Amino acid sequence: MELVLKDAQSALTVSETTFGRDFNEALVHQVVVAYAAGARQGTRAQKTRAEVTGSGKKPWRQKGTGRARAGSVKSPIWRSGGVTFAAKPQDHSQKVNKKMYRGALKSILSELVRQDRLIVVEQFSLEAPKTKLLVEKLKEMALEDVLIITGELDENLFLAARNLYKVDVRDAAAIDPVSLIAFDKVVMTADAVKQVEEMLA
């Protein structure tokens, strides 16, 4: 199959298995959920009654004081006592096979092509790292909410896009399923397309 280059009167021949496969919604959902789960910190931590600092001595005798019976100053019902079901650090990551991950990326790329959300250009670069230059270039292409993928990371482009809320710049090796579906449009350079094809082959 062929992808038309927007900035040139030519087309790029690409693999049908990468850019023309059926959309597997269940697979994409599973991989996106796993990717998001892997990004969770899971570092919250509280102390149980065993971990709270304090004496193990009974605060006062069982009977005769008129006060409620108490066996420990670390009791969860006491102020500064331990937490009953204390939260502990957790690893939320889910196992995803390479074949599944690559399959999901291929599925997403194919769907982007079908929905006319993937724009392929010969090259995409800036003379200087100026946000103004990038905004003008995107305005010319009628783009606003966009992910730009280049073969090698273009520093000028990266620096110019840092200040734009709905624009992100990646190199081909750094693509992920969440970013591909998060933006309205995805702009890829011809060399980025070839790199992604090799990566997912």
Curated annotation (Swiss-Prot):
Molecular function per GO: rRNA binding; structural constituent of ribosome
**Alphabetized SUPFAM superfamilies for the sequence:** Ribosomal protein L4 (SSF52166)
Q: Biological process (GO) annotations?
A: translation
The record's listing under InterPro entries reads: Ribosomal_uL4, Ribosomal_uL4-like, Ribosomal_uL4_dom_sf
Source species, domain of life? Bacteria
NCBIfam families listed in its UniProt record: rplD_bact
| Quaternary structure note | Part of the 50S ribosomal subunit.
Q: What is this protein called?
A: Large ribosomal subunit protein uL4
